[in-house]
Amino acid sequence: WMGITLAAMLGHIGTASGGFGFGYSSVNSTGDSFNRMPWQSLPQGKNKIRDFIPVARVTDMLENPGGEFDYDGKKLTYPDIKLIYWAGGNPFHHHQDLNRLVKAWQKPNTIIVNEIWWNSQARHADIIFPANTALERNDLMLNPRDPTLIANKKAMESFHNSKTDYEIFSGLAKELGFLEAFTENKDELDWIKFIWDSSSKAHQRKDVSFPKFEDFWEKGFFELPKPETEKVMLNDFRKDPNKFPLNTPSGKIEISSATIANFE
């Protein structure tokens, strides 16, 4: 916060090589002149349940069903969780008090996980769907900050009884009676082509042309052309703060925040 405040006082925000920057050791965009690219994703529908908790509150949630907690200045309520389905990530990896978590983890009636490894999460689950690794499936490797899209071709067949996440969820959809609605009669390669085609259309608005999917898949990667002008963070805001407001209550750089000050 004070770094942004100092940069604002110096008046360099929105200028080339000026302003401020964070996450230099955790993101791959340092010195990157590319704008954020509109890579597309799979259609996901809308979850009708809007309630949520921060992931760091998992243990608290299991310990205190119906209890209240503070989040972003609001009072939210913990649900009474009877079943957990965890796919992607591992709560036993990023929670500090593991003894507390292990005890709270016993409260739900059923724990289901998609897991690659026989780790703590798998050992504390009731049902385990053995998921395979990125080496055992076809996929795309991309990042909105990265100008290169890579064809991630599987290097080996699935080990033993492991399955891709798509195969696991398709199997569940079949058992629940909505296989066709979930898969739309597409296999994994069809969905990869869908992402490619929809990304190609999105990039046309930026005057970027994609090759044919078959040519990309054979070559193994596609690199976007470098823009003629480099992007300067907050340059539009500097030129016209009314037309390009920031995502703050005031639309400006806030050295102090009445909203945060009112948090209990």
PLM-predicted stretches and their roles:
Residues 135, 147-158:
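Short beta-alpha connecting loops at secondary-structure transitions
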Residues 78, 144-147:
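Active-site-adjacent bridging/hinge elements
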Residues 2-9, 170-175:
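Short, hydrophobic/amphipathic alpha-helical patches that form generic packing surfaces
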Residues 1-4, 96, 163-167:
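Conserved active-site and cofactor/substrate-binding residues in soluble primary-metabolism enzymes
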Residues 4-123, 133-140, 217-264:
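Extended redox/cofactor-interaction regions of prokaryotic respiratory oxidoreductases
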Residues 126:
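Catalytic, metal-anchored helix/loop core of enzyme active sites in primary metabolism
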Residues 43-48, 155-254:
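N-terminal leader/propeptide and maturation segments of large enzyme subunits in energy/redox metabolism
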Residues 129-130:
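Catalytic alpha/beta core of large soluble enzyme barrels
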